[in-house]
């Protein structure tokens, strides 16, 4: 998959927050934020789907290890609106990644790869990044 933005050497440590703010396209079908070691080893594939791949208004999360996808997790909370500015905050520890959505709802996704640092981020789809911050 071609990516709209790729960043490496992030060295995001457990407990640190990655905030991503951007604009959702007015005709959005889906967008993706990938976090991990590299494009073949992702501790989080975060994929809000407005209407894509048979899903509507659903967040699909997954992992990828050595190029092989894991089992998808579907999160029913969906606060994203086409044409809006939105922000997602992601923190992690040895056990879980915690994803805080724009409406304040939080959910956990297991750190299946036991990553101790996140060095890679990629974004693609119907989402234009305005700001990336580390806290």
UniProtKB/Swiss-Prot annotation:
Localization of this protein: Secreted, Extracellular space, Extracellular matrix; Cytoplasm; Secreted
Domain of life (superkingdom): Eukaryota
Binding positions for a beta-D-galactoside per the UniProt entry: 45-49, 53, 62, 69-72
Modified residues (N-acetylalanine): 2
Matches recorded under InterPro entries: ConA-like_dom_sf (IPR013320), Galectin-like (IPR044156), Galectin_CRD (IPR001079)
GO cellular component: collagen-containing extracellular matrix; cytosol; extracellular region; extracellular space; galectin complex; plasma membrane
List of residues that carry N6-succinyllysine: 108
The keyword S-adenosyl-L-methionine is assigned to this record: no
Residue span(s) of domain Galectin: 4-135
Keywords: Acetylation, Apoptosis, Cytoplasm, Extracellular matrix, Lectin, Phosphoprotein, Secreted
Subunit structure and binding partners: Homodimer. Binds LGALS3BP. Interacts with CD2, CD3, CD4, CD6, CD7, CD43, ALCAM and CD45. Interacts with laminin (via poly-N-acetyllactosamine). Interacts with SUSD2. Interacts with cargo receptor TMED10; the interaction mediates the translocation from the cytoplasm into the ERGIC (endoplasmic reticulum-Golgi intermediate compartment) and thereby secretion. Interacts with CD69.
Role description: Lectin that binds beta-galactoside and a wide array of complex carbohydrates. Plays a role in regulating apoptosis, cell proliferation and cell differentiation. Inhibits CD45 protein phosphatase activity and therefore the dephosphorylation of Lyn kinase. Strong inducer of T-cell apoptosis. Plays a negative role in Th17 cell differentiation via activation of the receptor CD69.
Protein name: Galectin-1
Organism, as annotated: Mus musculus
Taxonomic lineage from the root: Eukaryota, Metazoa, Chordata, Craniata, Vertebrata
Chain's gene name: Lgals1
């Amino acid at each position: 998959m071609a990516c709209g933005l790729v960043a490496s050497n992030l060295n995001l440590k457990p407990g640190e927050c990655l905030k991503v703010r951007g604009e959702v396209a007015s005709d959005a079908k889906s967008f993706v934020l990938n976090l991990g070691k590299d494009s073949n080893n992702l501790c989080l594939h975060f994929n809000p789907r407005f209407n894509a791949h048979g899903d509507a208004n659903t967040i699909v999360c997954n992992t990828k290890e050595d190029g092989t996808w894991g089992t998808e997790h579907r999160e029913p909370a969906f606060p994203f609106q086409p044409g809006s500015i939105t922000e997602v905050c992601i923190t992690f520890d040895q056990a879980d990644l915690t994803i805080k959505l724009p409406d304040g709802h939080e959910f956990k996704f297991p750190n299946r790869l036991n990553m101790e640092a996140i060095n890679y981020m990629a974004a693609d789809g119907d989402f234009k990044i305005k700001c990336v911050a580390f806290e």
